[in-house]
Amino acid sequence: MSEKLTAKQAAEQLLYKPEYAADKRADVKEKAAAFAEGYKAFLNAAKTEREAAAASEKLLLEAGYEKFEPKKTYAPGQKIYFVQEHKAVVAATIGRKSFEEGFRLVIAHIDSPRLDLRPNPLYEANHFSYFKTHYYGGIRKYQWGTMPLAIHGVFTRADGSNVSFAVGEDENDPVFCITDLLPHLGAEQNDRKLSEGIKAEELNVLIGSDAVEDADIKEAVKLNTLMLLHEKYGITERDFTRAEIEVVPAHKARDVGFDRSMVGSYGHDDRVDAYPALMAEIETKDPVHTTVCVLTDKEEIGSDGVTGMQSMYVFHFMQLLCRAAGQDDILAFQNSVCLSADVTAAYDPSWANAFEPQNGTYAGRGVAFFKYTGSRGKSSASDASAELVGDITRLLDANGVAWQIGELGRLDLGGGGTIAKYVANRGIPVLDIGVPVLSMHSPFEVIHKTDLYMAYRTFALFCQNAD
């Protein structure tokens, strides 16, 4: 039986006192700031899922990873990877224990909310040329007007050759924009609901206004724009039907605050988890269990398709490793553990009514865990066991990693799910984890550098030591 405590002793020993991780330790600030520099460079190089996959592959090759060969057997310590359809990456370090004794997975996604061009996007109206767009993921449409935009993508030309491009990122590049009404003529627009402030059919990107010098040509501005694209990239209008082209904010990742304690950027969701997961995988040496880092695609629209987590590509990779080694993949799945890494909402004092402060997650308090996610009555949640939460948090406590646990926001205001359930459906225990984000799904999201660094430390400890 525990000894009886005084009220003061009880307050000291029994109550949970949340702390801001960087307030107590100067070394954390320095290490977090240094780690954030690499992250900002990654963000600037990886504004689309294709670019994120390419940037990740470059880092893996520089670290000595070799391409996965399905029928080959691998020895402990070897590092392998593959890229799924140019848009998702799987990397692994072979562990000392057999595959049947389980994998250790960290899964994040590298797609972000954005605007995609439609199959036939180019048109002219009143001596302007435009691209029609189709929004991807849960954007708030009104946030995308009147700011500089860049256009990234790839054309597959009629001859089968590919051409990749990005316009709007270099200081000497032109940029693009979606126009909005002036307030002097905005009376009718002001009566719209916020969600309809700018409607989907009004998300048209302004791309030109010069015409070809030929009075007989109809749609002379459209043709002039197309001629410029043809001269630069060798494409025709028909090539847009064989293209994947995305419109993203043109700004770079920047430090936020006089103290530079935060990072503002497009694409924190979910590259703020993907980058530290990748770096932890790269730096893992001689792990106990085989580690698998997955940077997946299509999370923002339900994880469907051949590059999403509802596809089998990750699980086929694990099965192929097992089969080449003559081991049982069912046993391997049953003994595996996964961290599903996706962002969560940081408590925002300016919008406090959307949150429940006792169960919110806060920027600067460390990486956030979620025993469950989902909407309303935990709909579509993957609910981790108390034992799994205990195993992971004990590892972090033993190594001085700052962590917090909570929920997305006030009940019944909305909610959100993650890719955890698609891993859990394979019989693999999963715990949700992520970095808190201010202004999530906006063109300029904000994170705290300390939380980014604590996510990296969590993934590194899990990959190296989790047993």
Predicted segments with their positions:
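N-terminal hydrophobic/helix-forming segments and targeting peptides
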Residues: 1-467
